[in-house]
Amino acid sequence: YGLVGSEMCIRDSLYTILKLLSERGHTVVITSDHGTIRVDNPVKVTGDRETSANLRYKTGRNLAYNSRDVYEILKPEDVQLPSSNLTSSYIFAYNSDFLVYNNDANRHIRYYRNTFQHGGISMEEMIVPYIVLKPKQ
């Protein structure tokens, strides 16, 4: 598995706990608060210092972007999103896109390309993953 140190300890501990719960007849549900998506296509955005840092969405007052590359919400109140001021808007990345600032874009692209991210509106991010583990009868 290529695990070392604390990762191996956590994996072994989790396995031990799940095995013990199974032996005692317990059903276990494992879940997350959201899913993720692998991102590989950068979309350049410009914003001021107050613009959010998330890679899958941005909110702020002075966002500059190509509107064909993002899903934009110009009136957050229309979709019940919070607004920090009267001129705030939101943009969301499509598919496997991720949003990077124009300044230092190449460094961010190298760092974040092919990573798993969340915060967008794709099915993969909005569906909550879970698994139900039942003991053998």
Q: Positions of the model-derived regions?
A:
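Single conserved hydrophobic/aromatic residue that forms the stacking wall/gate
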Residues: Y1-G5, C9-I10
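Gly/Ser/Thr-rich helix-start
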Residues: L3, T36, I121
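Metal-dependent active-site segment of extracytoplasmic phospho-/sulfohydrolases and closely related
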Residues: I17-T46
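Active-site neighborhoods of enzymes that stabilize oxyanions during catalysis
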Residues: V39, K44-Q137
